Design a protein with these regions (language model features):
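NAD(P)H-binding glycine-rich loop region in Rossmannoid oxidoreductase-like domains
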Residues: 17, 21-85, 96-102
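A short acidic, often aromatic-flanked loop/helix-cap motif at beta-alpha or helix-coil junctions
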Residues: 34-35, 42-44, 133-134, 189, ...
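Actinobacteria-biased recognition of intrinsically disordered, low-complexity terminal regions
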Residues: 1-4, 17-24, 30, 41, ...
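Oxidoreductase cofactor-interface core, primarily capturing Rossmann-like NAD(P)-dependent enzymes
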Residues: 3-6, 10-25, 85-88, 99-207, ...
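Pocket-edge positions in alpha/beta enzyme catalytic cores
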Residues: 35-38, 63-67, 156, 186, ...
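Short, amphipathic alpha-helical "lid/cap" segments that border enzyme active or binding sites
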Residues: 44-47, 79, 161-169, 238-246
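Mobile cap/lid helix-loop segments that border enzyme active or cofactor-binding sites
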Residues: 188, 195-250
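Active-site beta-alpha turn of Rossmann-fold NAD(P)-dependent dehydrogenases/reductases
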Residues: 57, 91-94, 128-130
Length: 250
């Protein structure tokens, strides 16, 4: 099966390698390959003969208007090129709870992306993932003010990127869902707890201060904001945060 993965970062590179190991013709591409999803540059040639396209692209800017423009234009150009090429399955990676936190401009843009995919005329699957363990250091840095990390105690249900890749590969190689599937880690944990456990392993000396008003993706969280929806039948990954911390390279 020929599969084109748009986005060659943390998930895209792993996904392509996983698919190749399983015997598929899979390639992860980014701007360094002459691809620009916001303009359509390079898409037609890239999609020749492809059966599946996976959109893992992300906006280079976090400004609300820029993020919305990125996901809107990228999705429009990708779907148009896929329709022309006869692609039979369009897969995107979205975020668990994106539709429950409208105060976040980034998440509003992800919802707009989902809606465009649903109306795009290509059979599709939307995989909503919880936050990745790998992004906890970035969350800590974003919440640091004068050497103190401000982190909410509201829960996420984060997941190892390798587990996301394993389940994403099953979706990519299966029939289109024409719907949404959610994936998350095995346990809900407060953002402050995630950072403290990370620092206990890495020896980071920064104080972690619990702050219920600390922002996350531009909004305040409640415990139910970014966890799997009740009754969603979310797939729960096997890797715990503590196991991931123990195994992560230093």
């Amino acid at each position: 099966m020929k599969i084109i993965v748009f986005g060659n970062g943390l998930v895209g590179s792993q996904l392509a390698a996983h698919l190749v190991a399983a015997g598929h013709d899979a390639t992860a591409l980014g701007r360094d390959h002459g691809i620009d999803t916001t303009t359509g540059q390079g898409l037609a040639a890239t999609l020749v003969g492809a059966e599946v396209a996976v959109d893992l692209t992300n906006s280079p800017s976090w400004a609300d208007d820029d993020v919305l423009a990125f996901f809107t234009s990228s999705t429009e150009h990708l779907l148009a090129a896929e329709r022309e090429a006869g692609v039979r399955h369009h897969v995107i990676l979205s975020i668990v709870g994106a539709d429950r936190l409208p105060a976040s401009g980034y998440l509003r843009a992800k919802v707009a992306q989902e809606r465009a995919v649903e109306a795009g005329g290509v059979p599709y699957s939307i995989v909503r993932s919880a936050q990745f363990f790998e992004f906890v250091p970035g969350i800590a840095d974003a919440g640091t003010v004068e050497g103190v990390v401000h982190a909410t105690s509201a829960h996420l249900q984060p997941i190892a990127s390798r587990d996301v890749v394993a389940h994403l590969a099953e979706v990519v190689t299966g029939p289109p869902l024409d719907g949404v599937v959610e994936v998350a880690g095995p346990e809900p944990l407060g953002v402050d707890t995630l950072v403290r456990r990370l620092f206990a392993i890495t020896g980071d000396p920064r104080e972690v201060r619990t702050d219920r008003h600390a922002g996350y993706l531009g909004a305040e969280l409640e415990d139910t904001s970014l966890g799997p929806a009740p009754g969603s039948g979310a797939w729960l990954a096997p890797t715990t945060y503590d196991r991931w911390l123990a195994e992560a390279p230093r």
